[in-house]
């Protein structure tokens, strides 16, 4: 979600070299900060990866402007290759560093594999761009070759044979998912967003297969298995129905009944047995026992149900306003769309403070519900398909240019990923010290508070625009200030947070991510929490 001055946007092919350079400068600042903190051969690989991604990004941008890319990408943004390429490698580096400090060699190696996998899929995206660019850019190829050679050489001497095979497995899955999903979902992603989303899905799928084949009794937390199975199950379900409805009219009652029946068959016949094998107990009974285990969980579930009802009422109210409006193209204003950010903040903060495992599972269930409802809307499944199309069209923006509406799913992911990605085995009593204690709040701070306040103040009072963008200086400054106030409130209400005088790093992290929000054209609901998570965990 973005904040804008009331001025016309540049066309999709308009060059935004100033904003792209500023975005790159912010990303390089993050990379160098992590490099200075970690300072090992893997962080040097991250620097080399960032340099080649910076040069290749311009080739992707030219391909998008000329319409020469292999697939149809979202045209209202630049390629976003540089910021997306660095997320998985940097995340792996900070995870490795934290687990090394905690004396957990297994998850230290896991962090290295995450970093190596992120570098592999990023290099593949760069090679793809140069392979379809005509004439072949010799200088950029040399830079890519040098950076890739350094990374491959270091990883060859750092990874075991099994780890190399794991990286190659993820890369293979990533290639196939790119070919399938980018064909089925034109204009839903930029190259960078595809790299980030499909790379993450590929890694999750490979982890699930690996853990299913090497299962050991009592190994792993059931909530982790629950997340893996739900994500993979929903993706495979979407691919199955997309292929099926190529040959069927999805809008008929017969197809709708078949959709619901097949959903039940896949859930009861594939997903639940798969989860049962992993957790060694009845998944439904485990979930019910988990959700209603304590009085605190019952109170939180009741509170969240009220907030969900409130969100539905907001949607109904905005659609009622559209029905009474003379314009058929009435769109919800920026402030109305930010209501959902405030509702999500009110949802996540009590969960983080009182019961993070419950929030972990509840966010997973909510993700499955959101994706399922998007399938119903996309395939026009009766009886809710057309209703959802009408209701959700009110909240579209320029980033929902493809057949899928992903903004609300990205918002949920941005808030949930800091909860899901905490390396719990490498923490003391489930929390980290210093600035790292704010890691679970990264989504709340970056998107729930920062982006919301920036949008409201930037669109209503903003006058001074950042060069090359529609974002405003006033919006960014109020965003930083609001996040600082939020950190102070977290210190007051969450007794488990001890910042240990790391205030300068927190301020720098918040300011850096706010500047990234000002210049990026990617999905900030997803990108900003990940960068704030990386900086806070470093």
Swiss-Prot record:
The chain crosses the membrane at residues 14-34, 75-95, 112-132, 135-155, 164-184, 189-209, 225-245, 255-275, 298-318, 338-354, 360-380, 402-422, 437-457, 473-493, 496-516. Residues 35-74, 133-134, 185-188, 246-254, 319-337, 381-401, 458-472, 517-538 are cytoplasmic. Changing residue 441 to S: In CDG1M; 4% residual dolichol kinase activity; fails to complement the temperature-sensitive phenotype of DK1-deficient yeast cells. Complements the defects in growth, dolichol kinase activity and protein N-glycosylation at the restrictive temperature in yeast sec59 mutant cells. Ubiquitous. Belongs to the polyprenol kinase family. This is Dolichol kinase. The gene is DOLK. The keyword Lyase does not apply. It is linked to Congenital disorder of glycosylation 1M: A form of congenital disorder of glycosylation, a multisystem disorder caused by a defect in glycoprotein biosynthesis and characterized by under-glycosylated serum glycoproteins. Congenital disorders of glycosylation result in a wide variety of clinical features, such as defects in the nervous system development, psychomotor retardation, dysmorphic features, hypotonia, coagulation disorders, and immunodeficiency.
């Amino acid at each position: 979600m973005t904040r804008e001055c009331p001025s016309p946007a540049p066309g999709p092919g308009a060059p935004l070299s100033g904003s792209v350079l500023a975005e790159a400068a912010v990303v390089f600042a993050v990379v160098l900060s992590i490099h200075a903190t970690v300072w090992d051969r893997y962080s040097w690989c991250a620097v080399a990866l960032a340099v080649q991604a910076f040069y290749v990004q311009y080739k992707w941008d030219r391909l998008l402007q000329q319409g020469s890319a292999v697939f149809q990408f979202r045209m209202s943004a630049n390629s976003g290759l540089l910021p997306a390429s660095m997320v998985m490698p940097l995340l792996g580096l900070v995870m490795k560093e934290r687990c090394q400090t905690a004396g957990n060699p297994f998850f230290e190696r896991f962090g290295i594999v995450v970093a190596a996998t992120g570098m592999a899929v990023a290099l593949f995206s760069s090679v793809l761009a140069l392979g379809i660019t005509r004439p072949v850019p010799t200088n950029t190829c040399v830079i890519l070759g040098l950076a890739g050679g350094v990374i491959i050489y270091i990883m060859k001497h750092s990874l075991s044979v099994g780890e190399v095979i794991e990286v190659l497995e993820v890369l293979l899955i990533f290639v196939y998912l790119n070919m399938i999903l980018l064909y089925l979902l034109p204009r839903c992603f930029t190259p960078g967003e595809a790299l980030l989303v499909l790379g993450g899905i590929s890694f999750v799928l490979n982890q699930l297969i690996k853990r299913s084949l090497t299962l050991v009794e009592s190994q792993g937390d059931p909530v982790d298995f629950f997340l893996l199975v739900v994500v993979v199950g929903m993706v495979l379900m979407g691919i199955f129905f997309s292929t099926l409805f190529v040959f069927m009219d999805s809008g008929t009652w017969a197809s709708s009944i078949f959709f619901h029946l097949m959903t039940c068959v896949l859930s009861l016949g594939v997903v639940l047995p798969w989860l049962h094998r992993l957790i060694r107990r009845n998944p439904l009974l485990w979930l019910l026992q988990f959700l209603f285990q304590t009085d605190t969980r019952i109170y939180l579930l009741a509170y969240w149900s009220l907030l969900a009802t409130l969100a539905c009422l907001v949607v109904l109210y905005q659609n009622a306003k559209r029905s009474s409006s003379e314009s058929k193209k009435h769109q919800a204003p920026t402030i109305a769309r930010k209501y959902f950010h405030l509702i999500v903040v009110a949802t996540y903060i009590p969960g983080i403070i009182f019961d993070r495992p419950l929030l972990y599972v509840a966010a997973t269930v909510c993700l499955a519900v959101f994706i399922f409802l998007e399938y119903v809307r996309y395939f026009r499944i009766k009886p809710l398909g057309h209703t959802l199309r009408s209701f959700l069209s009110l909240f579209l923006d320029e980033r929902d240019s493809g057949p899928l509406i992903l903004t609300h799913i990205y918002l949920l992911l941005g808030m949930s990923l800091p909860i899901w990605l905490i390396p719990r085995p490498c923490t003391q009593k489930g929390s980290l010290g210093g600035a790292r204690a704010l890691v679970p709040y990264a989504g709340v701070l970056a998107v729930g508070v920062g982006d919301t306040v920036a949008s409201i103040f930037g669109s209503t009072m903003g006058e001074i625009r950042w060069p090359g963008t529609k974002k405003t200086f006033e919006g960014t400054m109020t965003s930083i200030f609001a996040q600082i106030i939020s950190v102070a409130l977290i210190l007051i209400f969450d007794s488990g947070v001890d910042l240990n005088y790391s205030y300068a790093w927190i301020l720098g992290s918040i300011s850096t991510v706010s500047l990234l929000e000002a210049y990026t054209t990617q999905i900030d609901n997803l990108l900003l929490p990940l960068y704030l998570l990386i900086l806070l965990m470093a």
